[in-house]
C-alpha cells in the first residue's frame, strides 16, 4: 500500500513537471509577442512662443505617423503668446492620438496660456506641488505690458472666454 501511494505521488509530480516544462517551452501567443504601445513624450518648458508651438505640432504629427498610443506633454510654463497658445490648442484638439498634458515636476506651473493648453488635452493632470491658473489675457505687444481701455479689455476677455468654453465643453469639462 505504501509503495503504491509512493508510485502515484511520483507519477503526479512527474506529470506536473512535464506539463510545466512543455508550457514554458511552447511558443508565445501573438498577444505576448506584440511590442509595447508607443508613448511619445514632449516637453513644454518655458514661455509659449512660435518655436514651441511648432515643436508641439511636429511632435503630434510624428506621433500620428508612428501610430503612437498616447502623447504625454510634460508642462512647466508661466504662459506666453496668445497666437502660439491657440496654435498648440488647435494641434492638440486635432490630434488623432490621445494627448495627456501633465504639469510637472514638483514646483512646476501651468499658468496663463499654459492653463488653457492644460484644459485642451484629452487628459489634464498635475503632479503634487504644482500650480495652474492666472489665465487672464494681457495686452503686451513686444512683451511690454500696456494699459488698455475697458471696452477693449472686455472684448479680449470675452473672446478668450468663448475660446475656453469651446474646447472645455468638447472635453466634457466644467466651464
PLM segments and residue spans:
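Hydrophobic alpha-helical context, especially transmembrane and signal-peptide helices
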Residues: 8-11, 37
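Bacterial N-terminal signal peptides
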Residues: 11-24
Amino acid at each position: 500500500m505504501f509503495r503504491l501511494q509512493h508510485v502515484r505521488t511520483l507519477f503526479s509530480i512527474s506529470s506536473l513537471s512535464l506539463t510545466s516544462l512543455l508550457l514554458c517551452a511552447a511558443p508565445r501567443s501573438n498577444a505576448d509577442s506584440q511590442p509595447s504601445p508607443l508613448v511619445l513624450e514632449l516637453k513644454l518648458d518655458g514661455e509659449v512662443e512660435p518655436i514651441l508651438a511648432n515643436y508641439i505640432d511636429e511632435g503630434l504629427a510624428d506621433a500620428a505617423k508612428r501610430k503612437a498610443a498616447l502623447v504625454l506633454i510634460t508642462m512647466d510654463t508661466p504662459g506666453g503668446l496668445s497666437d502660439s497658445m491657440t496654435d498648440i490648442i488647435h494641434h492638440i484638439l486635432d490630434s488623432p492620438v490621445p494627448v495627456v498634458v501633465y504639469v510637472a515636476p514638483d514646483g512646476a506651473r501651468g499658468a496663463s496660456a499654459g492653463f488653457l493648453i492644460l484644459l485642451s488635452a484629452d487628459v489634464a493632470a498635475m503632479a503634487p506641488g504644482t500650480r495652474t491658473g492666472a489665465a487672464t489675457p494681457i495686452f503686451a505687444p513686444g512683451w511690454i505690458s500696456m494699459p488698455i481701455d475697458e471696452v477693449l479689455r472686455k472684448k479680449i476677455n470675452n473672446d478668450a472666454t468663448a475660446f475656453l468654453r469651446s474646447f472645455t465643453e468638447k472635453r466634457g469639462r466644467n466651464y
